[in-house]
Amino acid sequence: MKLNIKTIHLIVVSIFLSISTVSFADVVEVFQWKAFPGKGQDMLESMSKAAKIYASEGGQVSIDAHNIGSTQLINYVIRWDNSKDYARSKDLQRSSKAWADFWAESNANPAGELVASFSANNLDPTKKASDFKGSYVYSAAIWKVNPGKDLALITRFMEAKPILEAAGARVEIYAGGWGAPGEYHYVLMYDSW
């Protein structure tokens, strides 16, 4: 039996998706915040305090200012290596004195408002939270997939990936979780502008 390249590619992508849905790596939560007027620095300081708590519990945090498409929004991004570490961190939060103290302080003098939040899972099961250490310039294209068209969209993403990587981008593909059902986030990352 002869298989053409397109059929082989489809089989590989299908296997990749099947494995990914069971063994997601790089679990991420994104919280988009907007500072109250005159409270931008206070909000960043509060985010830094929370980042230290997350780090002590196995999470990795990045704090990113939006550049295009928003007004003064800050993404607070928490990553875990896998679903098990994510669940462990969530369990720790329930009984954490550090979190109770943090939220008591933050609620007494709020510095911003939560605008949106969502979770996502990297489709590449080899990715870990530590793969995202550092500071990156990135763009995220968010795609809402039509029912039954997931595989076609992922196939297109995978076809474009080597082209973009040859141009210097690092490409990461995420499936949306809570707050982003039916979405795929196609993220292009660069070391600098």
Give each language-model segment a name:
Residues 1-7:
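N-terminal secretory signal peptides that target proteins for export/translocation
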Residues 21-193:
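Short S/T/G/P-rich N-terminal loop/turn motif that feeds into the first structured element of a domain
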